[in-house]
Amino acid sequence: MISVYSISLGCPKNRVDTEHLLGSLGVAVQPVEHLSRADVVLINTCGFILPAVEESVRTIVETIDDLSGLRKRPLLAVAGCLVGRYGAKELASELPEVDVWLPNQDITAWPAMLAHALKLEGAVTPGRLLSTGPSYAWLKISDGCRHNCSFCTIPSIRGGHRSTPADVLEREARDLVAQGVRELVLVAQDVTAWGEDIGAPHGLATLLERLLPVPGLARLRLMYLYPAGLTRELLGFMRDAGAPLVPYFDVPLQHAHPDILSRMGRPFARDPRRVVERVRDFFPDAALRTSLIVGFPGETDEHYAALTSFVEETRFTHMGVFAYRAEEGTPAAEMPEQVEDRVKEWRRDALMEVQAEISEELLAVHEGTRQQVLVDAPHEEWPGLHTGRTWFQAPEIDGITYVSGPGVEPGALVEADIVETRTYDLVALA
């Protein structure tokens, strides 16, 4: 057995990569809560945007400092998008204290590389060590991206789109549910693109046909649905499939004005209203989440006003807004008409205020209703209180439901009365 202290930065896809690595070393792995008790310290980094790069480097440096005072120093391994973006050779010259760099070019090789560094003798076998508890798990269905958005570094870091075969994903889904997982959350850079590169006859629907019948699965949630991929055929399949597929749509629109979408390199998304209308044609009561970028090069006051009007009209259930940052190596970083930081930040904050009012109004409708709540974990401070989620709340990015009452325990799916609503959260009694 080896003990591991792990830090996973960035998106859920990184978390899945960490879990696969730790579950595939061919020996029993014991997670520990302090690096002084570890045989190996693993940092899975993010490098998508500059603040993520800075956080990753800071985390590595702080960890090196913490390790320097230990009598028995664990092996330090660093993986993830920071390595993919800057390369192991360049990073090693700046941070020689790191023992192992795990590059993004072949994530499947990580277990063998780390096992070799640890001098482990057992055969490396595919597996996964869950870190999210019994209620939910992320299921990464593909890696890389086929799009060329002008602001994004992901294709250069993660490479082109590569789908994981359906039989592999079905087997993993069954294993996760057998461990007690109630909700599977499908993630990728573009979930709707699954199957295009491996000849799946009906694209994503082919995969869903394999996953939906998994015995014991209570919820199947789809994230990162690209606008162009939400075809009428896919939406019709999803409507007819019904439970455990939840009518929750995470669609990263990024903007609403065609001028800005064209500059972003997203011509397939130039009519976001039509995308929203199409979803609501099939799912009138759908929960809609989106992410938007403000302050993109060339965004004028008029463009921003149009975006604000779009948000007010559309009334998303959940929304994230990001101030544009110029990323080295991307076409957008070289564009003229860069927007001042103070303007970008004001636009972000103002748009989030608009969304806060919308979210509060939409959640208030649920007060007095009865909802199924999937219980995630005990509250850290209040005995008897747990945190969980309704079908319209995705883990870690949306609001939560505070729930208490008989039968409330992690992994339980309970019927509960919504007794109070807040801007983003609910309070419920089972």
Curated annotation (Swiss-Prot):
Belongs to the methylthiotransferase family. RimO subfamily. Residues 2-119 form the MTTase N-terminal domain. InterPro entries: Elp3/MiaA/NifB-like_rSAM, Methylthiotransferase, Methylthiotransferase_CS, Methylthiotransferase_N, Methylthiotransferase_N_sf, NA-bd_OB-fold, Ribosomal_uS12_MeSTrfase_RimO, rSAM. GO terms for molecular function: 4 iron, 4 sulfur cluster binding; aspartic acid methylthiotransferase activity; metal ion binding; protein methylthiotransferase activity. PROSITE patterns: MTTASE_N, MTTASE_RADICAL, RADICAL_SAM, TRAM. Catalyzes the methylthiolation of an aspartic acid residue of ribosomal protein uS12. This is Ribosomal protein uS12 methylthiotransferase RimO. Binds 2 [4Fe-4S] clusters. One cluster is coordinated with 3 cysteines and an exchangeable S-adenosyl-L-methionine. One of its GO terms (cellular component) is cytosol. Residues 364-430 form the TRAM domain. Its main location: cytoplasm. The keyword Transferase applies. Pfam families: Radical_SAM (PF04055), TRAM_2 (PF18693), UPF0004 (PF00919). Residues 131-361 form the Radical SAM core domain. Its EC number is 2.8.4.4. [4Fe-4S] cluster 2 binds at residues 145, 149, 152. [4Fe-4S] cluster 1 binds at residues 11, 46, 81. NCBIfam families: 30S ribosomal protein S12 methylthiotransferase RimO (TIGR01125), MiaB/RimO family radical SAM methylthiotransferase (TIGR00089). It is an enzyme of class 2 (transferase). It comes from Nitratidesulfovibrio vulgaris (strain ATCC 29579 / DSM 644 / CCUG 34227 / NCIMB 8303 / VKM B-1760 / Hildenborough). Keywords: 4Fe-4S, Cytoplasm, Iron, Iron-sulfur, Metal-binding, S-adenosyl-L-methionine, Transferase. GO terms for biological process: tRNA modification. Signal peptide: none annotated. SMART domains: Elp3.
